[in-house]
Design a protein with these regions (language model features):
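Cys/His-coordinated zinc-binding microdomains
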Residues: 170, 183-186
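Non-catalytic, peripheral interaction segments enriched in hydrophobic/basic residues
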Residues: 1-54
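Secreted/processed peptides and extracellular or luminal domains of membrane proteins
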Residues: 172-175, 188
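Short cysteine/histidine-rich zinc-coordinating motifs and their immediately flanking basic loops
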Residues: 177-183, 193-197
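Charge-dense, extended regions
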Residues: 68-72, 80-81
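Helix/loop segments that flank and initiate small ligand/metal-binding modules
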Residues: 82-172, 197-200
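Intrinsically disordered linkers and flanking regulatory tails adjacent to Zn-binding modules
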Residues: 194-208
Length: 209
């Protein structure tokens, strides 16, 4: 998981303080554990195809589980995805898709609330893809709540150097919500626009040269 998290941070341009939930929400990646479980279920489902070498070996629940296997772990979960006579190629593809859909839905349901919104993170508008990488990285940082554009964050990592007050109005904390509520820089935009209207936010924050 550590190498994957580091790669996602690099791809997004986020800070080391950024939580795992934000990284996976932004990149739409399953965690390593979730992905491995999904692949294990899909592999076990493949043994239910008529042409598979293990198809002729029926599953029999052990009287006592001494050691977990794919069968003891996932048999109950995939029972509805195959027939006793075995799956053909079309049925197998449908089963693989169902396992993938279930894994993604479970990951989304288990995701922690976004730290800025205190709610599940909504979908990011496709319009963000039109922005340069530097602007998209800053927007992702702001959605995480940890950004070098925020005095609160800079004060947290270098307490004796940076002041947590807003450089425009002098109030604290200078965090992501404050950017849209600063009396010295009024706007009709709000925090949700970081997701729904990233182009307008990038323009408001002068992120695009």
């Amino acid at each position: 998981q550590v190498p994957q998290s580091a790669a996602l941070r690099t791809a997004l341009g986020c800070t080391k303080m950024t939580d795992l939930g934000h990284l996976h929400s932004e990149c739409k990646f399953l965690t390593v554990e979730e992905h491995n479980k999904m692949l294990a279920k899909q592999f076990y489902l493949s043994t239910k195809q008529t042409g598979h070498a293990n198809f002729s070996i029926p599953y029999q629940p052990p009287s006592r589980i001494m050691k977990q296997s794919l069968a003891t772990l996932y048999e109950d979960e995939i029972q509805g995805l195959y027939t006793q006579n075995g799956n053909n190629a079309a049925q197998h593809k449908i089963g693989l898709r169902a396992i993938h859909t279930e894994a993604v839905a479970a990951s989304i349901a288990a995701a922690p609330p976004n730290k800025v919104l205190q709610l599940p993170a909504p979908e990011i508008s496709q319009s963000e893809s039109k922005l340069p990488r530097s602007a998209r990285s800053t927007l992702s940082q702001l959605r995480s709540g940890y950004s070098s554009s925020l005095m609160q964050y800079l004060n947290r990592i270098k307490l004796n150097i940076y002041d947590p007050h807003c450089p425009r109005c002098g109030t604290v904390p200078h965090d992501t919500p404050h950017l849209f509520n600063c009396p010295a820089n009024p706007t009709s935009l709000n925090t949700l626009d970081l997701w729904s209207n990233p182009e307008a936010v990038a323009d408001f924050l002068d992120l695009v040269p």
